[in-house]
Amino acid sequence: MNILSEMPTGMGGKWVLVDYGNNFYAYGTENCLHDLLGFPVDQCGTKEEVLAHCKSISKLCKQNIDKYKKEFAREKEKSDGWKILIEHEQKELEMLTEFARILSE
């Protein structure tokens, strides 16, 4: 097992990208890395499968960020809720972009 990259979640934890060898990769939180059940099934597989998943979820993050920014702009009382959601999506997007870059090499 080789940890290829670590990225902060923005909530005190880390995302990790792991190469288990034999063309098997996974990404998720540190908790997934140490969990008996391992990584979620949609976050592991061949290099190509994990890369495709990172790219797919990146698109969703971008859509969510746009949607949350619009909701935040409409809100009269600027609560921290939308800001927190935007920050979380941005951190996840950064992680997915970095992991996709690494997997593309």
State each model region's role.
Residues M1-G10:
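Negatively charged, low-complexity tracts enriched in Asp/Glu with abundant Ser/Thr
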Residues M1-N2, R74, R101-E105:
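Short intrinsically disordered terminal tails
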Residues I84-E87:
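Extended alpha-helical stalk/coiled-coil segments
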Residues M11-W82:
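Acidic, low-complexity, intrinsically disordered interaction modules
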Residues E89-E105:
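Amphipathic alpha-helical coiled-coil segments
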Residues E6, C61, E89-E92:
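Polar/charged side chains located within well-ordered beta-strands of beta-rich proteins
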